[in-house]
Amino acid sequence: MTQLAVPSPVAPTFPDLVEIQRESFLWFLREGFEEELLSFSPIIDYTGKLELHFLPEYRPGDPSKGYKINRPRYDPEEAKRRDATYQAQIRVPTRLINKETGEIKDMDVFIGELPLMTDRGTFIINGAERVIVNQIVRSPGVYYKSELDKNGRRTYSASLIPNRGAWLKFETDKNGLVWVRIDKTRKLSAAVLLKALGLSDSEIYDNLRHPEFFQKTMEKEGPYTEEEALMELYRKLRPGEPPTVSGGQQLLESRFFDPKRYDLGRVGRYKLNKKLNLNVAESVRVLTVTDILAVIDYLINLEYDIGHVDDIDHLGNRRVRSVGELLQNQVRVGLNRLERIIRERMTVSESENLTPASLVNPKPLVAAIKEFFGSSQLSQFMDQTNPLAELTHKRRLSALGPGGLSRERAGFAVRDIHPSHYGRICPIETPEGPNAGLIGSLATHARVNQYGFIESPYYRVENGVVRKDLGMVYLTADEEDEYRVAPGDVPVDAEGRITADLVPVRYRQEFTTAHPTEVHYVQVAPVQVISVATSLIPFLEHDDANRALMGANMQRQAVPLLKPDRPYVGTGLEAQAARDSGMVVVSRTNGVVTYVSADEIVVRPDDGGDPIVYRLQKYQRSNQDTCLNQRPLVYTGDRVVAGQVLADGPATEGGELALGQNVLVAYMPWEGYNYEDAILISERLVYDDVFTSVHIEKHEIEARQTKLGPEEITREIPNVGEDALRDLDENGIVRIGAWVEAGDILVGKVTPKGESDQPPEERLLRAIFGEKARDVRDNSLRVPNGERGRVVDVRIFTREQGDELPPGANMVVRVYIALKRKIQVGDKIAGRHGNKGIISRILPIEDMPYLADGTPVDVVLNPLGVPSRMNVGQVYECLLGWAAEHLGVRFKLMPFDEMHGLEASRLTVEAKLREAREKTGKDWIFNPEGKYCGKIQVFDGRTGEPFDQPVTVGRAYMLKLVHLVDDKIHARSTGPYSLVTQQPLGGKAQQGGQRFGEMEVWALEAFGAAYILQELLTVKSDDMVGRNEALNAIVKGKPIPRPGTPESFKVLVRELQSLCLDVSVHKVEVDSEGQTHDVEVDLMADTSNRHTPSRPTYESVTSEDLSPSPAFTRVLRTADANASRSLEEDEDEEEEEDF
């Protein structure tokens, strides 16, 4: 493994990349859950006789105290196998006090079940791995903003936003008065609010820096007493109700000073103290009079240009809510419901017999937690396509979800990259489409602090010297604004002194330059700005951001291949990404390997403890149907150290991420087969399994209890030949190892059928012979259309074995089918620079363009895909990969290498190519002179002639993406129709048709293809009578009759009529005297027959009809010039026939 000649700064090892998930969940277990229980304790009944106390305080070192989590019933692997949830029971110590008798009852009460996090940062809910995405929301606190009215007068407003409770908004107007709105209600004078809080005039004026500004507001309202102010407050908030002083008092208390109704949260209190320079204790989570006065004071100061307004998109004002906090909020919802139930039970039951266990019902808490994990927008099915996808999913930041934004309301400002994102949120990795900017990814070195604000690490700089010896300092976006921060690629000498005269710095969100002695901090590494996926792109700085975004997103869609191959050109972050994803097995201790097999590794630790057994995953199915398989990397007798990779997982090789393959590419056009991003590949990629991947599909069937009796899993299936049952065992379940194709039976199942289900011929047989034909129907599980493969696993679940089954099911059988998918035309492949394309042709090896030594290239890419897309990084990568192959080394390049001098990338690549040329003695590898620098003479495989121009050839790292043509290709003959419009449904899952949209209609109109157009809009779509008649005509070999009225036209007419528009359809008829009459057509004439299913009738088909008629034979011979004429004659003959 050769390092580059240019010294790359060693990035400090990243923090643990899944830390954000694990730490947050641990906080919930240690503090969050306890905090919630304490906030509800004690629960007192309506008469005040009974009190129920929760005593969940966690005492480290004293296991008798605190709430207890029982051992989970299943381990994570078993939970996955059984489709169960990996969860544990929670028991909380409670105390019930009877005030009348003084009796005290203590006991541990079961309060509910809590899903536990696996060591990989995921949850297993009903057998599926899920991830709780981190939510980024506006932080509670006070926000000031300024607005210009239409006269150009500037007004200011302050919004006081709590964690939960009523909003308070103060605003100034053009007359210099201060108003307040409570929860967006009508305006109320701020003087009235302050008076209602019991403040005297002198107390108000003493606490303001500019009392003269507020005097106008006080004078306008007149001299209010506290009682009058409370009445006025009540009048404004509850118009229409008779105002009372006590009502006003209670309203004010409950809105802002009751901890149950109003909560600033720890963060809100911290932000409020910081912004307004207060020193209220952090435990005070409600508003105080001091807070309200300080908010008004700051607002008035803004009128005198003291202080500054806030930017709500600044990361100092947005915080991250991770798993722990989201779960805590959900527990609060459950405990609220529980509190109501406990109070009711206290009132209803006899107090002598009450125990804490009889009061506490675990259902509401269990339901709230289940709802959160099962259906919350932030609880997502884990993206398990490859290790990077899994890692990125756990580090995702979403602005959507409950309490966040919605796609429709989010404007440009929220989505935009903000200067404070620097080093905290990746400016590149975000989805394309409606979620752009709302979903981001945490930067590589960023971490979330105790308040939920994102911090980024820096080294301190003193007098122009970078002090790495002092360790890293983590700063939030707010703190960083006060300092001059230099980027991580500033040139420094051996002592750490900055060598440049002027350094680019960021200061107060501006990018400027400064002298080295003025710099306060310097970034830890150049990659700390970007996310993990983005930092895996080599030569990132030479790619346009839009393409880098696609490159980062497409790496997450790469399918793990059969033979993983590390990139020749990497960035050095592959190993850590693979390790933290949890897909590789890592040694926990130093020791010696004592046993290795395909499915387990045993290590004897050096400290003499028990041997550690590491179980490997073998051919498991991932959430995305890719194959999870781990392969041992160590041998018996090897010494291992803690943190060493013991076994590779999917898409990793040697403990490094290996998402794709290093293939030989040439940038040249080839017979138009790489027009518009299409890609031409060599047959070698198919034969050598270069881009072959394994996919595992799951098929499931339930045997249920029906009204007519139980369904049965059996081999005895009616009307099925022995051939179709050849792979089923005696129970009717397919054997492991069988090869199955579309339509084959996987599990035989028969369902009892009632009298009504029997066809007429069966009823006739029973009437004549009186025997019961076996009254069951075939309901077997079959391989779906377009799928095939080998059965790799069969799992049977029954109640007798103690499995939990869905209600009504007696038995569940699950069959897993694996298939090797070779690369084929229509598959999508891509590079790491956003250069994606569809395979258009697979060419025999001998026809591919070849090099001077006879090596055929693997992939031919279009050179026109580079200049307009501006992702030149792919060219650098392909040339450096070319040098790497000939030198027999792999390169690791940190992105942003310009710190080593101008054009460092180009000079490095050139130097390595020269070195390769000299070492191998092959002069044709690199041509350093002239305008063809870096290009090679390539020969046409078909003729052996050289191509006109030299061509860029090299080793590029290409990925096969999960968008495989096998999963997308789909055809429909007849199938389901939409109920209202009667048009075919859309989509593969619905067995749907292809949409013929308005633009396609325009195309046919432009060609004047009237009959094709008419068919497409009627008999092939929603003319119900016409399509049945057309099918009958085709079956009988007769000409297709004229189409009728489309159903959607009838729907349109009915909709217009429902808007009270008199719309009707008329036709002009001519009578025998030549007079024209206007006749209204009843489009709904056939509604009486609508309840019959729309399918063709075969009653009138005779055996003569089914033999190919001359008319039908003539239709097939379309080349015959007389065909059209003979069809017209046939039509005339058949007019009389009753269809």
Swiss-Prot record:
Residues 1128-1139 have a biased composition (Acidic residues). One of its GO terms (molecular function) is ribonucleoside binding. Residues 1085-1139 are annotated as: Disordered. Transmembrane segments: none annotated. Residues 1086-1106 have a biased composition (Polar residues). InterPro entries: DNA-dir_RNA_pol_bsu_ext_1_sf (IPR042107), DNA-dir_RNA_pol_bsu_external_1 (IPR019462), DNA-dir_RNA_pol_su2 (IPR015712), DNA-dir_RNAP_su2_dom (IPR007120), DNA-dir_RNAP_su2_hyb_sf (IPR037033), RNA_pol_bsu_bac (IPR010243), RNA_pol_bsu_CS (IPR007121), RNA_pol_bsu_protrusion (IPR007644). GO terms for biological process: DNA-templated transcription. Keywords: DNA-directed RNA polymerase, Nucleotidyltransferase, Transcription, Transferase. Belongs to the RNA polymerase beta chain family. This is DNA-directed RNA polymerase subunit beta.
